[in-house]
């Protein structure tokens, strides 16, 4: 009887413990749901990021809502993924004052590259060129200004070398910035130049024999002294003779079957013995 009652008490305890665990689990799930409520999509979120969320110094991309610096707007570089920062950019040709709006205040580059719509600055038609300072010269095909003293100095200073064109003549540059004046050409200057180029030292009879004597004496010195070519030729002939004799000796020894392993040494010893015997004989 007591055993059955103890079994029932154990079962009740197990059931109560399981119920308590279930209650704790349900309470934890409820607290988690209260901490992070489910968000429902609204009409504003479905339409995209709200406009005006970026500060006044920023530009908001239309699709991503990213805020980029306002200076990146209409700078011909896609900073937004949808390219909205380069849309509705008003670009007009350069005006006579050398301005390309927008943005105002930026000078027309006048670099020969079509930076504005219509290519008006490509041929420098609507671009104003800055004037050179006093005492300076503008290059013909560029906006570079160089000092007038660099004109016709023998060194090209302009990219197109226009500062060295027309030197020595009364030629006016295409830009009209400077005129180069050369020295006046007179009859006396032409006559003096011709005399300087054609007239040489006077030719006399004394100068002609002296040249001939010098030539003959140098030739006699060369013929009287032995040259090194004969010595070199003799040495070459002697070397060739020695090589030929050596080759003939080796061929003869090979024909006599004496040029075998240690055969050459034996032959040399025999030749030495023969020479000693010949010298010992009276």
Curated annotation (Swiss-Prot):
Coiled coil: none annotated. Ca(2+) 2 binds at residues 150, 153, 155, 157, 163-164. Disulfide bonds join 54-67, 61-80, 74-89, 132-145, 139-158, 152-167. The chain crosses the membrane at residues 230-250. SMART domains: LDLa. It comes from the Eukaryota. One of its GO terms (cellular component) is plasma membrane. SUPFAM superfamilies: LDL receptor-like module (SSF57424). It holds the Pfam family Ldl_recept_a. GO terms for molecular function: calcium ion binding; cargo receptor activity; cobalamin binding; growth factor activity. Residues 1-35 form the signal peptide. Ca(2+) 1 binds at residues 72, 75, 77, 79, 85-86. Residues 210-223 have a biased composition (Polar residues). One of its GO terms (biological process) is B cell costimulation. Residues 36-229 are extracellular. Residues 251-282 are cytoplasmic. Receptor for transcobalamin saturated with cobalamin (TCbl). Plays an important role in cobalamin uptake. Plasma membrane protein that is expressed on follicular dendritic cells (FDC) and mediates interaction with germinal center B cells. Functions as costimulator to promote B cell responses to antigenic stimuli; promotes B cell differentiation and proliferation. Germinal center-B (GC-B) cells differentiate into memory B-cells and plasma cells (PC) through interaction with T-cells and follicular dendritic cells (FDC). CD320 augments the proliferation of PC precursors generated by IL-10. Interacts (via LDL-receptor class A domains) with TCN2. This is CD320 antigen. It comes from Homo sapiens. The lineage of its organism: Eukaryota, Metazoa, Chordata, Craniata, Vertebrata. The gene is CD320.
């Amino acid at each position: 009887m007591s055993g059955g009652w103890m079994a029932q008490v154990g079962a009740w305890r197990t059931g109560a413990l399981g119920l308590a665990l279930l209650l704790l689990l349900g309470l934890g799930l409820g607290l988690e749901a209260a901490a992070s409520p489910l968000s429902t999509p609204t009409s504003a979120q479905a339409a995209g990021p709200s406009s005006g969320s970026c500060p006044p110094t920023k530009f908001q991309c239309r699709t991503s809502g990213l805020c980029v610096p306002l200076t990146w707007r209409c700078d011909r570089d896609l900073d937004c993924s949808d390219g909205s920062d380069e849309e509705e950019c008003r670009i007009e040709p350069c005006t006579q004052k050398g301005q390309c709006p927008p943005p105002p205040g930026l000078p027309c580059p006048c670099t020969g590259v079509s930076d504005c719509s219509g290519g008006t600055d490509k041929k420098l038609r609507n671009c104003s060129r800055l004037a050179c300072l006093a005492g300076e010269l503008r290059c013909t095909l560029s906006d570079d200004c160089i000092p007038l003293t660099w004109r016709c100095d023998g060194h090209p200073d302009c990219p197109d070398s226009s500062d060295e064109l027309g030197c020595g003549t009364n030629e006016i540059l295409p830009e009209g910035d400077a005129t180069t004046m050369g020295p006046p050409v007179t009859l006396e200057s032409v006559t003096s130049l011709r005399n300087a180029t054609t007239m040489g030292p006077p030719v006399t009879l004394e100068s002609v024999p002296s040249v001939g004597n010098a030539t003959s004496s140098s030739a006699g010195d060369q013929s009287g002294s032995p040259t090194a070519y004969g010595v070199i030729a003799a040495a070459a002939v002697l070397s060739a003779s020695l090589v030929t004799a050596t080759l003939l000796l080796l061929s003869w020894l090979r024909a006599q079957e004496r040029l075998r392993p240690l055969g050459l040494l034996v032959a040399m010893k025999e030749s030495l013995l023969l020479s000693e015997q010949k010298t010992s004989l009276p």
